Regions:
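N-terminal segments that mediate ammonia production and transfer
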Residues: 1-103, 109-284
Length: 284
């Protein structure tokens, strides 16, 4: 389980700059629980660069330096809370970078051990780590190559296969490419992970969410003068501050050239409580 943040701007900007100091501090503090690493990828034109770590972001001066000094016309940031059984290693830190794309995911896909089935041997050879998230990413790139289609076409095809053949808790993701920032909001809204106290960060359990809680998997975006920011829940995102909730089962596309925002409905639905009961998935 993780926290996602992405942006597109008319000019080069850093993570700290696009959030503002108060929201940046609040976002970084989410790593008290999402403490298994951080990553930031930034892009200008077709160029893409990134830095990742297995450290707790709030306690890592390198994170503060990267968040302040690494600038781009677009970017994606990630705070990791590792799923059980997936090692906390640099190769498993998000965002993953392959070719001209960066990708970060929040959620789990079960059964993990079957995920290699969605990749050919050629694409399996490109894997750098052991996560379900990187396999999800490479499946999208593979579909783009196989069918000669763009991200907007490939993503729904991969999402459909993942929901039909596997049991995901959430497929929420951000994919940054040369043309746009693509944000997938596709999750079981009836569930949330149990958030442990900061001193105990290894728990990863899903329970029914209550109506009083801000849903863990919610995503929102905000348009300001020359910048669009998209973020997971966890820090203040008031409607009065311009934040708008992204509908579940939708794909948000932020054009990097125009900053135009398009929300596309997805014919994909996750019902984890039902699927887990029938599939016997381990959702700890």
């Amino acid at each position: 389980m993780c926290r996602l943040l992405g942006w597109v701007a008319r000019e080069r900007r850093s993570l700290r700059d696009v959030l503002g100091e108060e929201s940046f501090v609040a976002f970084a503090q989410l790593s008290r629980i999402h403490a298994d690493g951080w990553g930031v990828a930034t892009a200008d034109g077709a160029g893409l660069q990134g830095e990742c770590s297995t450290s707790n972001a709030a306690a890592d001066p390198v994170f503060r330096s990267v968040a302040t000094n690494s600038t781009g016309q677009a970017g994606v940031a990630h705070l990791r809370w590792a799923s059980p059984g997936l090692p906390v290693e640099p190769c498993n830190a998000h965002p993953f970078l392959h070719f001209r794309y960066a990708f970060a995911h929040n959620g789990g896909i079960y059964p993990f051990e079957r995920l290699d089935e969605i990749l050919t041997a050629e694409w399996q050879a490109k894997l750098q780590g052991t996560t379900d998230s990187e396999r999800y990413f490479l499946a999208v790139l593979a579909e783009m190559e196989r069918s000669n289609v763009d991200v907007v076409t490939a993503l729904p095809r991969v999402l459909r296969r993942l929901t039909e053949e596997f049991t995901p808790s959430s497929l929420n993701a951000m994919m940054l490419g040369p043309e746009a920032l693509y944000v997938v909001n596709c999750h079981d809204a009836s569930l949330r992970p149990v958030l442990p106290p900061p001193e105990k960060q290894s728990v990863d359990e899903l329970v029914e969410a209550t109506e009083e809680e801000v849903p863990y998997y919610d995503l929102r975006y905000r348009r300001t003068d020359g910048t669009v920011v998209v973020a997971s829940s966890g820090f203040a995102q008031p409607e009065g501050g311009g934040w708008r909730r992204i509908e579940n089962n939708s794909l948000l596309v932020v054009d990097r050239a125009t900053l135009e925002v398009t929300e596309i409905p997805l014919d994909v639905h996750i019902g984890l409580a039902v699927a887990a009961d029938s599939a016997g998935a381990d959702l700890r």
